[in-house]
A protein has these predicted regions:
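CN hydrolase (nitrilase-like) catalytic-core segments centered on the catalytic cysteine
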Residues: 1-10, 79-167
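A cross-domain feature marking catalytic cores of carbohydrate-active enzymes
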Residues: 13, 74, 131
Length: 172
């Protein structure tokens, strides 16, 4: 799809590699080539009973994208102070923060987003946050309701509220 439409794409998935499973994020350039594969480093993504084949990645890194130095932190990765310090050492221009959270629209839009903005403010770069959205279960309270934001210096610079369909276009 990236190549067909000449469009860069970044997406999360459960990766299987050599008998191990990882919570991963892959980024493709407009030509459809893999330009990054990041594996979540924090342990919170798996069920407590998961076996040793469910693993975390080995660390953070950056990759070039559209003239910027990009780093990725998946879901819970940015809630560990040691991870914040490691990301800041990399000195990225932008950090992508894709997550899966199941806050209600009002929980996210009224309170939780402020906590995320504060946490993102510990990173010395703008943070692009995006939550998954589940369109097939509108009555289910325990599913991702979407939402996206540009966090910078502890503030919300731009946002697409949870529960709203749309596109958030930002420059950073």
């Amino acid at each position: 799809m990236a190549k067909e439409f000449s469009l860069a794409v970044s997406f999360g998935f459960i990766e299987k590699d050599c008998g191990s499973f990882f919570s991963s994020q892959m980024t493709l350039d407009p030509g459809g080539r893999i330009i990054d594969l990041y594996r979540r480093v924090s342990p919170g993504w798996k069920e407590p009973f998961a076996g040793k084949e469910y693993r975390e990645g080995s660390g953070f890194h950056t990759f070039p994208f559209l003239g910027k130095k990009i780093a990725v932190g998946l879901c819970g990765d940015l809630w560990y102070e040691e991870n914040i310090a490691l990301l800041n050492e990399l000195d990225p221009d932008v950090v992508w923060w894709p997550v899966y959270t199941d806050y209600t629209d009002s929980e996210w839009n009224e309170k939780a987003k402020l906590e995320y903005a504060e946490q993102a403010g510990k990173i010395h770069a703008p943070v692009l946050y995006v939550n998954s959205v589940c369109l097939d279960s509108s009555g289910d309270s325990e599913i991702a309701k979407g939402g996206a934001a540009l966090f910078e210096k502890g503030s919300i610079k731009e946002e697409l509220p949870a529960g709203k369909e749309g596109t958030l276009i930002v420059e950073c």
